Design a protein with these regions (language model features):
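A positional/architectural concept
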Residues: 1-43
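Charge/polar-rich, low-complexity and marginally structured segments
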Residues: 44-171
Length: 171
């Protein structure tokens, strides 16, 4: 997530060129992009509040894990993350999220999940003017509301309660 801090004119190969000066504070980087090329290189405005709300709703949905090879899915996830589309990034976060009671992720799954979560939290924090930590908390709260995760947690609580009753009767 970068911020345009100015527009400057530079002489390049004898031509005068207007450039956006984009600062990436978290990455400690400054980028200069020719004004006419801004959209073709992927620069865009921040998402609006409606898009953020839809992204958080997407995260609450049921994960869609395709049964294709991991390398193919990883490429698709990477493409969604790099697209910059907040809804597509939310889909990656939803699909790769693992709660405490689920099996662990592979290293590459974890890397993709963290990249998607980072991009999503940066955008939400900028749009809602909150900290990235608060944005991550919002995302994780919505992930916990997912039908699969909520039902599984309730089911496990019911099993534990039944086990406790069985142990009490045996004693």
């Amino acid at each position: 997530m970068g911020r345009i801090v100015g527009i400057e004119t530079q002489e390049v190969a004898g031509y005068s060129l207007d450039l956006f000066v984009v600062s990436f504070i978290k990455d400690k980087m400054t980028l200069r992009v020719p004004v006419p090329k801004a959209t073709s290189v992927g620069m865009r405005k921040l998402a609006d509040n409606a898009t953020v709300k839809k992204a958080l709703e997407t995260v609450r949905g049921r994960a869609r894990i395709k049964r294709t090879m991991w390398s193919r899915r990883a490429q698709e996830y990477e493409a969604k993350i790099n697209s910059g589309d907040l809804i597509a990034i939310a889909e990656v976060v939803r699909d790769l999220y693992r709660s405490e009671n689920q099996p662990e992720q592979s290293y590459s799954e974890r890397q993709l999940y963290e990249a998607a979560l980072d991009r999503m939290s940066r955008e939400i924090s900028s749009v809602n003017r909150i900290s990235e930590t608060e944005a991550i908390r919002q995302i994780e709260q919505n992930l916990a509301k997912s039908p699969r995760r909520g039902a599984k947690a309730e089911e496990e609580a019911a099993v534990e309660a039944t086990d406790d009753e069985t142990h009490d009767e045996a004693a």
